[in-house]
From Swiss-Prot:
Subunit structure: Part of the 50S ribosomal subunit; part of the 5S rRNA/L5/L18/L25 subcomplex. Contacts the 5S rRNA and the P site tRNA. Forms a bridge to the 30S subunit in the 70S ribosome.
Record-linked Pfam families: Ribosomal_L5, Ribosomal_L5_C
Chain ranges passing through the membrane: none
NCBIfam families: PRK00010.1 (NF000585)
Chain's gene name: rplE
Function, in words: This is one of the proteins that bind and probably mediate the attachment of the 5S RNA into the large ribosomal subunit, where it forms part of the central protuberance. In the 70S ribosome it contacts protein S13 of the 30S subunit (bridge B1b), connecting the 2 subunits; this bridge is implicated in subunit movement. Contacts the P site tRNA; the 5S rRNA and some of its associated proteins might help stabilize positioning of ribosome-bound tRNAs.
Record keywords, A-Z: Ribonucleoprotein, Ribosomal protein, RNA-binding, rRNA-binding, tRNA-binding
Name this protein carries in UniProt: Large ribosomal subunit protein uL5
GO cellular component, one term: ribosome
GO BP annotations, alphabetical order: translation
Family as reported in the entry's similarity comment: Belongs to the universal ribosomal protein uL5 family.
GO molecular function annotations of the record: rRNA binding; structural constituent of ribosome; tRNA binding
Length: 179
């Protein structure tokens, strides 16, 4: 079992149940999935960009990403319907907790000029989104073998009913919020 999953079950869940004054342990908010998305506008001109992004996300997550396609044509962006424009991965269960552990312990401390995560990036329903400017913060990516620096979006979907519950959950996981 993943280290963070055990910590959640044995320490975080009972503490949150008491803190949020919940009657049942099943009401305690938990992380249900983590979605990593890489939007690749530059893939329009070069098809190799998608292959490199797929390889990078696969190294980071240990899971094969899904290529996303444009839903409709947009002349301003020179995009046609059906063209590949991004890659995404959805992590659940043990892989999700292992990724979260690596993100908090290894990757975030490697971000240049890191002052903490924005505590206001919740969506109103307890889900948290953050952006990473470069994929090289992950130790699985070899700096010498990348073709370009690419950012990615990380979304943590929780069962929390409000932003305050979601914030309490992520603070219990020791998320480094700045404010």
């Amino acid at each position: 079992m993943a280290r963070l999953k055990e910590i959640y079950r044995n320490e975080i869940a009972p503490k949150l149940k008491e803190e949020l004054k919940l009657s049942n342990v099943m009401e305690v908010p938990r992380v249900t999935k983590i979605t990593l998305n890489m939007g690749l506008g530059e893939a329009i001109g070069d098809k190799k960009v998608i292959e490199h992004a797929v390889a990078d996300l696969e190294k980071i997550t240990g899971q094969k990403p899904v290529v996303t396609f444009a839903r409709k044509s947009i002349a301003g962006f020179k995009v046609r319907e059906g063209w590949p424009i991004g890659v995404k991965v959805t992590l659940r269960s043990d892989k999700m907790y292992e990724f979260l552990d690596r993100l908090l312990a290894i990757s975030l401390p490697r971000v240049r000029d890191f002052r903490g995560l924005n505590a206001k990036s919740f969506d109103g329903r307890g889900n948290y989104s953050m952006g990473v400017k470069e994929q090289i913060i992950f130790p699985e990516i070899d700096y010498d073998k990348i073709d370009a620096l690419r950012g990615l979006d990380i979304t943590l979907t929780t069962t929390a009913r409000s932003d305050d519950e979601g914030r309490a959950l992520l603070r219990a996981f020791k998320f480094p919020f700045r404010n």
